[in-house]
From Swiss-Prot:
The keyword Ubl conjugation does not apply. Its main location: cytoplasm. The gene is arcR. GO terms for cellular component: cytosol. This is HTH-type transcriptional regulator ArcR. Positively regulates the expression of the arcABDCR operon under anaerobic conditions, thus playing an essential role in arginine catabolism. May also control the expression of genes encoding proteins which are involved in anaerobic metabolism. Can bind cyclic AMP.
Length: 227
């Protein structure tokens, strides 16, 4: 009986995951229902690796909930970090490409993902123009965020760089609460220091200044950034 319950729960999780995928792609669930047996839903604890480099090059993933850190390594060994929250399909830049993906994805909070065969999504793109257009728009949004982060890193003044990286985080993983952005569960001075490439001590001083100026409110790892 316990085994049957587990199978039913897993099937329900997969069905719900497919509904979220269909909503993300802006298509009826029936379009992807036929591929249900080829997909999977998994839960990852904080710190677990979801994929590393070309371990699973045949899948792309929709983050159903939680926050992940993706680190891409180029030919020179430089690492590029990206933080993503729920309702994001990744790695989109792996679609229609045969090259190895030098990327590691780690769960920063507990999270659930649905894995979708890469060739299945490519097939759907080729046969449904609206899916291709949707994914193209999503990829452009991701590239715009990456450009915002890269531009923040080119800023020479420490305070200005910290502020710009904070706003990048607001746009990437924050929640718009009208008068402020809220970044939940993960924010620390060390994380901000790492992402900005500025010492922890300097980052701490700047964060203190922002708090004094009422531009930032900290509640543990939940940070509120005033617009």
């Amino acid at each position: 009986m316990a085994g049957k319950t587990y199978i039913n729960n897993r099937d329900n999780d997969l069905s719900e995951g497919l509904k979220q995928l269909a909503s993300y792609l802006n298509i009826p669930t029936g379009v992807i229902q036929a591929f249900k047996s080829e997909c999977f839903v998994r839960r990852y604890n904080k710190g677990q690796i979801i994929y590393y480099s070309s371990d699973q090059p045949t899948y792309v993933y929709l983050l159903l909930d939680g926050i992940v850190l993706r680190e891409t390594i180029n030919e020179d060994g430089d690492a590029y970090r990206k933080l993503n929250k729920e309702q994001l399909l990744f790695p989109l830049n792996h679609l229609f490409r045969k090259i190895e993906l030098n990327e590691m994805c780690t769960a920063i909070t507990p999270c659930n993902v649905i894995g979708i065969p890469k060739d299945m999504l490519e097939y759907l793109c080729k046969n449904h123009d609206d899916i291709f257009v949707t994914l193209f728009e999503k990829l452009n949004n991701e590239l715009e965020l990456l450009m915002e982060y890269n531009m923040a890193l080119t800023t020479k003044l420490a305070r200005e760089r910290i502020e710009k990286v904070l706003y990048y985080l607001c746009h990437a993983i924050g929640y718009d609460q009208d008068e402020f952005y809220e970044i939940k569960h993960i924010m620390t001075i060390q994380l901000l220091s790492d992402l900005a490439g500025i010492s922890r001590e300097t980052t701490g001083h700047i964060v203190h200044e922002l708090k004094e100026e009422k531009k930032l409110i900290k509640n543990g790892k939940n940070w509120m950034v005033i617009k």
